[in-house]
């Protein structure tokens, strides 16, 4: 199996919980209908998945060509490149859906990115704790 059941559950639970949090928070904070923020969240999540596949394909190709090791510096460049590229695509989406200027969308998108970093840390910690309690031990190869 190309993608394990465990990875599918992890990815889907991560995205669904994040989508619910973002849709409700944006709807409440900006007084925008939940249908708008929910749709925006879904479109951004799908965009992120596709961008992830495209970006990583070309990044790994570049890595192989230049025989780069995954040092901290390379990982930081990867993260900045991924998030920066994603923001270039999502900022116009946010501006349109939320009926705001590009500058406001940049600020909102950056804020969302920072919140998602915190969410990712908390989600992963909780997920690992649950797996540990269920007796799952990850194999590292």
Curated annotation (Swiss-Prot):
Keywords: Antiport, Cell inner membrane, Cell membrane, Membrane, Stress response, Transmembrane, Transmembrane helix, Transport. It comes from the Bacteria. GO terms for cellular component: plasma membrane. Mediates the efflux of short-chain diamines when energized by an electrochemical gradient. Involved in resistance to the synthetic biocide chlorhexidine, a widely used antiseptic and disinfectant in both hospital and community settings. Interacts directly with chlorhexidine and mediates its efflux via an energy-dependent mechanism. Induction: Induced by chlorhexidine. Belongs to the proteobacterial antimicrobial compound efflux (PACE) (TC 2.A.117) family. Pfam families: BTP (PF05232). The chain crosses the membrane at residues 16-36, 39-59, 76-96, 103-123. InterPro entries: BTP_bacteria. This is Short-chain diamines transporter. Disruption phenotype: Deletion mutant shows increased chlorhexidine susceptibility. It comes from Acinetobacter baylyi (strain ATCC 33305 / BD413 / ADP1). It is found in: Cell inner membrane. It is a multi-pass membrane protein. GO terms for molecular function: antiporter activity. Its main location: membrane.
